[in-house]
């Protein structure tokens, strides 16, 4: 299997889902970088741990205040910043084993039955593995983001949205020139937009008309010319959107096989 690091993050409202996802990854002995973006001390201490899992506490003082997850979910701006943090460490790694790792961002609501299929798809693709989400960019991107980036809504408005739930970056397995392009064309500008509130969350935007990190990722994927993947959960062995609303009322304590059956896709 191509070496892969799974990256994720959660605050208290996704603690239960994170425990389930980390449990699934521990059973696969996966390499994981897990970021605490707002867990209580008790929750952080209760997370599954194993040798391949590195736990980080997100360093909020280093970043603009709009990343605060307690205010409008931090505009989801912490996600591109975390992805860039991991990718930049891989790019500068002295250890060859670390430098060969690809990166898979996975929202805390994902659940893994396998790693090899998605690792193979990332390594064998064009450099960025990403699927589509519902609707078009015109429907789910506030015009202020296009204004900030100085690009035409007409040029991108009819294009499909990218799904930022599960995104793979072949930064370790790709040839150096392609890995550089992934960083230059996707990772770096995704982070730059996330750090600028007028870009990732322009005035007048909300979850009713904008998809923050996903909106700018969609633009960058289209601009760079990456193709969307069509892989299903059956092929990948990864389920997404397992953090369904009813778990808020009934809890996340179900056995893993039952929990995984309730994932959206």
Where are these regions (language model features)?
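Glycosyltransferase catalytic domains, chiefly GT-A lineage
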Residues: 1-265
